[in-house]
């Protein structure tokens, strides 16, 4: 299924039902009073967060939704049936904005969390409601209130514990495949991954760890280059970043070039991203040039802790997994 992380919806709640004009008609009561019931309330439009969906793809072709209107009132003081609420499922991690003002209406970050985005119209009053000591036979009733209509902008931010970041072709897809059961597209050319993918790493002593493979960032991503804004926003909720570097591409002229480029983009987008804890990992240690590149990087990075792995061969992964669990178990690293 194609990953879609933005969608625009037009939603409308149900109109209230019309009140009824009716008079009591029974044997031996020739002049029964008014008995018109009220109309029913229109249905609300409710967004519901669910982990059963991981993308906004289901809104690609259907983007207009309307809740049920309220039923009409009837005689014998019978009220109209309330319209059913319309429940629209969205993935956990969806931010709901008013498309016209960009104001955030809701941040649905918890399973089964709900938000009423449009309230149904109130039902109209039947003619019985308008009787008085001086007006005993009103021959009119009230129309139901119109429902609300809104245009919503949905933005999905993945809820993952760990985010994999790095330049294109650093080996992020190979790493998430090696660590989890995820199966993203893998290739020996930049931008193989065009959308985030998720995998789950089982912690034998704690909760499962969700890892997100974030598509490769490029210079200018913080300003939107290469769909940078859409990729970077998925990192905002990560508790830990794995900063992956292709060791075979480290050069003597500027050993820290790729490392500094990614950190610059993170900080430019949001200072908080640049301050997130990172595990720096040199990948592709199976390639001939990687050993020299790793030495150059370590000589230039000072006291920075660096791990070396080969995602393709599975080398060094046990140490990386231990480092991930150790970081996430630290106080204050649990999700709020």
Swiss-Prot record:
<keyword id="KW-0963">Cytoplasm</keyword>
<dbReference type="InterPro" id="IPR014100">
    <property type="entry name" value="GTP-bd_Obg/CgtA"/>
</dbReference>
<dbReference type="Pfam" id="PF01926">
    <property type="entry name" value="MMR_HSR1"/>
</dbReference>
<keyword id="KW-0342">GTP-binding</keyword>
<feature type="domain" description="OBG-type G">
    <location>
        <begin position="160"/>
        <end position="329"/>
    </location>
</feature>
<dbReference type="InterPro" id="IPR006074">
    <property type="entry name" value="GTP1-OBG_CS"/>
</dbReference>
<keyword id="KW-0479">Metal-binding</keyword>
<dbReference type="InterPro" id="IPR006169">
    <property type="entry name" value="GTP1_OBG_dom"/>
</dbReference>
<feature type="binding site">
    <location>
        <begin position="213"/>
        <end position="216"/>
    </location>
    <ligand>
        <name>GTP</name>
    </ligand>
</feature>
<feature type="binding site">
    <location>
        <begin position="166"/>
        <end position="173"/>
    </location>
    <ligand>
        <name>GTP</name>
    </ligand>
</feature>
<dbReference type="GO" id="GO:0003924">
    <property type="term" value="F:GTPase activity"/>
</dbReference>
<dbReference type="GO" id="GO:0005525">
    <property type="term" value="F:GTP binding"/>
</dbReference>
<feature type="binding site">
    <location>
        <begin position="310"/>
        <end position="312"/>
    </location>
    <ligand>
        <name>GTP</name>
    </ligand>
</feature>
<dbReference type="Pfam" id="PF01018">
    <property type="entry name" value="GTP1_OBG"/>
</dbReference>
<dbReference type="InterPro" id="IPR045086">
    <property type="entry name" value="OBG_GTPase"/>
</dbReference>
<comment type="subunit">
    <text>Monomer.</text>
</comment>
<comment type="similarity">
    <text>Belongs to the TRAFAC class OBG-HflX-like GTPase superfamily. OBG GTPase family.</text>
</comment>
<feature type="binding site">
    <location>
        <begin position="283"/>
        <end position="286"/>
    </location>
    <ligand>
        <name>GTP</name>
    </ligand>
</feature>
<feature type="binding site">
    <location>
        <position position="173"/>
    </location>
    <ligand>
        <name>Mg(2+)</name>
    </ligand>
</feature>
<feature type="binding site">
    <location>
        <begin position="191"/>
        <end position="195"/>
    </location>
    <ligand>
        <name>GTP</name>
    </ligand>
</feature>
<protein>
    <recommendedName>
        <fullName>GTPase Obg</fullName>
        <ecNumber>3.6.5.-</ecNumber>
    </recommendedName>
</protein>
<keyword id="KW-0547">Nucleotide-binding</keyword>
<dbReference type="GO" id="GO:0000287">
    <property type="term" value="F:magnesium ion binding"/>
</dbReference>
<comment type="function">
    <text>An essential GTPase which binds GTP, GDP and possibly (p)ppGpp with moderate affinity, with high nucleotide exchange rates and a fairly low GTP hydrolysis rate. Plays a role in control of the cell cycle, stress response, ribosome biogenesis and in those bacteria that undergo differentiation, in morphogenesis control.</text>
</comment>
<dbReference type="InterPro" id="IPR027417">
    <property type="entry name" value="P-loop_NTPase"/>
</dbReference>
<dbReference type="InterPro" id="IPR031167">
    <property type="entry name" value="G_OBG"/>
</dbReference>
<keyword id="KW-0378">Hydrolase</keyword>
<keyword id="KW-0460">Magnesium</keyword>
<dbReference type="GO" id="GO:0005737">
    <property type="term" value="C:cytoplasm"/>
</dbReference>
<feature type="binding site">
    <location>
        <position position="193"/>
    </location>
    <ligand>
        <name>Mg(2+)</name>
    </ligand>
</feature>
<dbReference type="InterPro" id="IPR036726">
    <property type="entry name" value="GTP1_OBG_dom_sf"/>
</dbReference>
<feature type="domain" description="Obg">
    <location>
        <begin position="1"/>
        <end position="159"/>
    </location>
</feature>
<dbReference type="InterPro" id="IPR006073">
    <property type="entry name" value="GTP-bd"/>
</dbReference>
<dbReference type="GO" id="GO:0042254">
    <property type="term" value="P:ribosome biogenesis"/>
</dbReference>
């Amino acid at each position: 299924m194609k990953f879609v992380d933005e969608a625009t919806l037009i939603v409308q709640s149900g109109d209230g039902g019309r009140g009824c004009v009716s008079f009591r008609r029974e044997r031996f009561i020739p002049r029964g009073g008014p008995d018109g019931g009220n109309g029913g309330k229109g249905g609300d439009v409710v967004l519901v967060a669910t982990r059963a969906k991981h993308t906004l793809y289901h809104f690609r072709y259907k983007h207009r939704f309307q809740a049920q209107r309220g039923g009409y009132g009837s005689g014998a003081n019978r009220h109209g049936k309330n319209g059913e609420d319309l429940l629209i499922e969205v993935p956990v991690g969806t931010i709901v904005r008013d498309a016209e003002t960009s104001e955030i209406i809701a941040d649905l970050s918890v399973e089964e969390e709900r938000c009423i985005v449009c309230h149904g119209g109130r039902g109209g009053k039947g003619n019985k409601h308008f009787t008085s000591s001086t007006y005993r036979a009103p021959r009119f009733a009230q129309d139901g209130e119109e429902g609300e209509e809104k245009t919503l902008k949905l933005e999905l931010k993945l809820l993952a514990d760990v985010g994999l970041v790095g330049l294109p072709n650093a080996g992020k897809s190979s790493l998430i495949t090696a660590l989890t059961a995820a199966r993203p597209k893998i290739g020996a050319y930049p931008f193989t991954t065009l959308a985030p993918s998720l995998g789950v790493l089982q912690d034998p002593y704690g909760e499962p760890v969700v890892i997100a493979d974030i598509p490769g960032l490029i210079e200018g991503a913080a300003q939107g280059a290469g769909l940078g804004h859409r990729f970077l926003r998925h990192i905002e909720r990560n508790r830990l970043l794995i900063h992956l570097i292709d060791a075979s591409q480290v050069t003597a002229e500027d050993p820290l070039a790729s490392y500094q480029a990614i950190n610059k983009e993170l900080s430019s987008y949001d200072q908080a991203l640049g301050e997130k804890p990172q595990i720096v990992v040199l990948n592709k240690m199976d390639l001939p040039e990687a050993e020299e590149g790793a030495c150059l990087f370590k000589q230039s990075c000072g006291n920075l802790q660096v791990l070396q792995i080969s995602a393709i061969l599975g080398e060094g992964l046990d140490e990386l997994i231990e480092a991930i669990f150790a970081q996430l178990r630290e106080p204050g690293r649990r999700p709020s």
